[in-house]
Amino acid sequence: MATGRTHRPATRSRGIPEATVARLPLYLRALTALSERSVPTVSSEELATAAGVNSAKLRKDFSYLGSYGTRGVGYDVEYLVYQISRELGLTQDWPVAIVGIGNLGAALANYGGFASRGFRVAALIDADPAMAGTPVAGIAVQHTDDLDRIISDNGVSIGVITTPPGAAQQVCDRLVAAGVTSILNFAPTVLSVPEGVDVRKVDLSIELQILAFHEQRKAGEDSAAEDEGAPPMRATPASRKGPDGDMPAVMPA
């Protein structure tokens, strides 16, 4: 039975920083890969490298979980997978509703990685009447007119918005009114929500802009390196000043 509406992970009450919470999925992904290879233990250095963080930060993060590892042995992989999964609330079923079944919404509905991480796509919702009843990833799309009932019937507390930006706030308001308390927003707009509702924004264009910044910086470094390796330019004779100042008396043809 879905319990997503009532359960809350203990991260806030235990005072785990948000930055640490944001890194826990990175550790879990690396640990899951180790578990699938039947690796029993892992050192903080090895796990930090796999997760893309430094080992001191990893050890500090794990101290919030009460996990310090064993000197000379490292961390028990299976126990850490369980511990982090429990902390993130992934040891239970989280029914999710996706609103906006265009290309992105349909792609998310077809993504097979949700179920293995504790998330079940319970409902697909769209404003287009022509979409109603259309199966996507084996789930029939339902109309937004029935949103309140859909959320209630499926015990949904997590909503995913993949609508055009102009419709996102209205959809957000309706989800919140129906009882949704966590929203993943893919629409390129900022949502306003009441206290107690968590929103995570995914903006692919921003991520691309950040990559463009790094590409530009790397290109600048390469250009500077080429300039440093180039032979010095020979000095050219000073131009003869004309009667009107710095311009030569006779301009080149």
Curated annotation (Swiss-Prot):
The keyword Repressor applies. GO terms for biological process: negative regulation of DNA-templated transcription; response to redox state. It is found in: Cytoplasm. One of its GO terms (cellular component) is cytoplasm. Its main location: cytoplasm. InterPro entries: CoA-bd (IPR003781), NAD(P)-bd_dom_sf (IPR036291), Rex_DNA-bd_C_dom (IPR009718), Tscrpt_rep_Rex (IPR022876), WH-like_DNA-bd_sf (IPR036388), WH_DNA-bd_sf (IPR036390). One of its GO terms (molecular function) is DNA binding. Residues 26-65 bind DNA. Disulfide bonds: none annotated. NAD(+) binds at residues 100-105. Residues 217-253 are annotated as: Disordered. Keywords: Cytoplasm, DNA-binding, NAD, Repressor, Transcription, Transcription regulation. Homodimer. HAMAP family: Rex (MF_01131). Modulates transcription in response to changes in cellular NADH/NAD(+) redox state. Belongs to the transcriptional regulatory Rex family. NCBIfam families: PRK05472.1-3, PRK05472.2-1, PRK05472.2-2, PRK05472.2-3, PRK05472.2-4, PRK05472.2-5. This is Redox-sensing transcriptional repressor Rex. The lineage of its organism: Bacteria, Bacillati, Actinomycetota, Actinomycetes, Kitasatosporales. The gene is rex.
